[in-house]
Structure formats: C-alpha cells, structure tokens
C-alpha cells in the first residue's frame, strides 16, 4: 500500500513538473512574440495599488474613495446643461498640470472659454487644444495623443458633439440610426487598452437626452450608445441644486450654485457616494469652502456659534471670513487639507509627515537665503 502511494506521488510530481515546464516554455514564447510583461503572475506586479490623480476637489476625492481619478482608466462626467461638467473637468486639467503632467482638451463643442479655464488654474499656454471637424477626427486625435504615452490627461468635451462624418456630409433630416453609437463602440475598443498601458486618464464629458414614451423609471439617458457606460471605470452625475446669493452689494445677485456630484459607477472603490461643492461663477469649485465644511464636520476646525477656530486660534466669524482667511494663508490651508485626507485614509501618516517636512525645508531655505542677503527672483 505504501509503495503504491509513493508511486502515485512520483507520477503526480512528474506530471506536475512537465506541466510547469510546458507553462514556462509557453510564457517564454509569448514574451518573445509580444514583449516582456505580456503575461505575468498578478503577485509579480510591482504596483498593485491603483494609482490616482487628485480631481482638484477635496470633496470629490473623498467621494471617489481612492483619492482621485484612477490612472489608466476612462471617466465619464454627465449631467444637465450648465450643471458644471466642464468646470469639474477643467479642475482635473489644472491638477494634472500642477503635478507636472501634460493635458489635452478635445473641444468638440467649440465652446471652451480660455479666460475661464485660466481662472480655474489651467495654464492655457501649455494646454493642448483641438477643435475637430468631425467625431472620427476628434477620437483619432485623442487616440494618437494617448498612444504617444506623453500625455497624462485627455478631456473630450463632449460625446454628444462628436458628430460622425457621414452625418456632417449628409443633409439635415437624413436618418443615421446608430451611427454615433457604432463610432463610440469602435473607439472604446481601440482606446481602452492604450489608455491602460500608458496610464492616461481619459475624461469624456456627456450630455443628457430623454427617452421617448417612458412611463416608469428614469427617462434620462446619455447619447453615444452603451459602450462608454461599460468601458468607464468611473461615472459622475453632476447636478446643480440651489443658487448661492452674494453678500453686501451683491445680496440680490447670484454668485454661484451648490452642486452635487454623485459617483454612480466606480470600479476602484464603493460607488454611490456624493460630493457637495460650491461652484462660484468665474472661479470654479470653492476649495476653501469645501475644506471649511468638511474640516468642521470632522472637528479639525472647531465651530463655536458663528466663529471658526483652528488649534485655539480664531480664523474668522462666519464661513465667508474663514474661507477668506484660508485663502490668504495657503500653508495653513495645506496643513488642514492633509489632516482631512489622513482622516479619510486618502493619505498615509508617513506621507503627511513627509509633505510637511518638505514644506518646512522650503520655508527654512527661503529664510536662510534672506538672512544671507541672496536676491530672490520673483
């Protein structure tokens, strides 16, 4: 009996060795034909954690769960007209440039306002802009930029404005059933692998349409077929809620609007979280406003009556004064922002200490240069 078991073990071992050798040979052939890394064991990957880039909004980073937009993924931002979709995308462009990356904007709607983009922090001198004549041209340009591997972010504004060439060449009233959907489906199949390989973030802005004859359920849908819905790792629904009235001389005029951004699909973190932000006209998302609100809820900023204080020091009476104080003190803003991110697990304690050390070193170096009488360039 023992001899029989031993013999069976030897056969199993021999068979296992042969299978392993066959697998190794197959992997070598695949690497030879398709390059190193074409097939790999998941545990061998150097970076298993999803890499992200901040959205430019603290509240949205928290709602996204991972701390920002995942790199190498497709993002869809949709909502009603004038809800703030392009504003959200432009904040991502500004953030990409802030981190030293290159951003491209495919303006299919031919409606980008350079002055507004600059007000949001976008370096318009460095922004790559394309205003294509047709949907195929716009998607082809986006594909070539992504394939280059040199672009960190590509924004397409919008999917609804990507008109197929056949529709442009035809007459108004001609029927082109499913033409745009087929174009988008083909584009998603071609672009998805390249986007993942180059770690480019691709943001597609989309509009809303109404389904005809829907009696029950949500009649709203997005144009361009279903392909984008499937391929997108994150889908954001942007809706403006109430108007924000001014103070003093502007008390009767609207200076912005409160906006809800709902994460309706998320492949890298739990979905259905909502970010509430203030979009101020001419300024974009109020970063100080969202920080004051979130930090107050976490008791990082203390609120007593109308007064806001931090570490025992009063920073303003009323939220507007607190926002103004943080805007005038960027180092304090960054310090509170880091504490909030650590609280939500978006930043490790060690990363926070490292960031604070770098900021401290920069301040010390500046003070040393001034003490030594070295001229500092503006």
Curated annotation (Swiss-Prot):
Pfam families: RecA, RecA_C. The gene is recA. Keywords: ATP-binding, Cytoplasm, DNA damage, DNA recombination, DNA repair, DNA-binding, Nucleotide-binding, SOS response. NCBIfam families: tigrfam_recA (TIGR02012). Its main location: cytoplasm. It comes from the Bacteria. Can catalyze the hydrolysis of ATP in the presence of single-stranded DNA, the ATP-dependent uptake of single-stranded DNA by duplex DNA, and the ATP-dependent hybridization of homologous single-stranded DNAs. It interacts with LexA causing its activation and leading to its autocatalytic cleavage. This is Protein RecA. ATP binds at residues 79-86. InterPro entries: AAA+_ATPase, DNA_recomb/repair_RecA, DNA_recomb/repair_RecA_CS, P-loop_NTPase, RecA-like_C, RecA-like_N, RecA_ATP-bd, RecA_C_sf. Belongs to the RecA family. It comes from Streptococcus pyogenes serotype M3 (strain ATCC BAA-595 / MGAS315). GO terms for cellular component: cytosol. GO terms for molecular function: ATP binding; ATP hydrolysis activity; ATP-dependent DNA damage sensor activity; damaged DNA binding; single-stranded DNA binding. The keyword Nucleotide-binding applies. One of its GO terms (biological process) is SOS response. It is found in: Cytoplasm.
């Amino acid at each position: 009996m023992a001899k029989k078991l031993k013999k069976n073990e030897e056969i199993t071992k021999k068979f296992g060795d042969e299978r392993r050798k066959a697998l190794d040979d197959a992997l070598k052939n695949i690497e030879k034909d398709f390059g190193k890394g074409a097939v790999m064991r998941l545990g061998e990957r150097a970076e298993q954690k999803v890499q992200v880039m901040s959205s430019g909004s603290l509240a949205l980073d928290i709602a996204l769960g991972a701390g920002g937009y995942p790199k190498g993924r497709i993002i869809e931002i949709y909502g009603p007209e004038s809800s703030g979709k392009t504003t959200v995308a432009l904040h991502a462009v500004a953030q990409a440039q802030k981190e030293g990356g290159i951003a491209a904007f495919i303006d299919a709607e031919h409606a980008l306002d350079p002055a507004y983009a600059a007000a949001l922090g976008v370096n318009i001198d460095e922004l790559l802009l394309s205003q294509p004549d047709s949907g195929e041209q716009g998607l082809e340009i986006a594909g070539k930029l992504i394939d280059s591997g040199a672009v960190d972010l590509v924004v397409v504004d919008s999917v609804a404005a990507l008109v197929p060439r056949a529709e442009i060449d035809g007459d108004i009233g001609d029927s082109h059933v499913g033409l745009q959907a087929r174009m988008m489906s083909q584009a998603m199949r071609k672009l998805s692998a390249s986007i993942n390989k180059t770690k480019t973030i691709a943001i597609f802005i989309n509009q809303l349409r109404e389904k005809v004859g829907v009696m029950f359920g949500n009649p709203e849908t997005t144009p361009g077929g279903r392909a984008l819905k499937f391929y997108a790792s994150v889908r954001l629904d942007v809706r403006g809620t109430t108007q924000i009235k001014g103070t003093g001389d502007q008390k009767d005029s609207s200076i912005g609007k409160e906006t809800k951004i709902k994460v309706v699909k998320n492949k890298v973190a739990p979905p259905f979280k909502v970010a509430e932000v203030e979009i101020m006209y001419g300024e974009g998302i109020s970063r100080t406003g969202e920080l004051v609100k979130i930090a107050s809820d976490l008791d990082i900023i203390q609120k007593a009556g109308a007064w806001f204080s931090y570490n025992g020091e009063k920073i303003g009476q009323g939220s507007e004064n607190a926002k103004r104080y943080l805007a005038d003190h960027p180092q304090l803003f960054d310090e509170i922002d880091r504490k909030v991110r650590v609280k939500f697990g978006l930043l490790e304690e060690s990363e926070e200490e490292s960031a604070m050390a770098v900021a401290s070193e920069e301040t010390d170096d500046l003070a040393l240069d001034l003490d030594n009488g070295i001229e500092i360039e503006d």
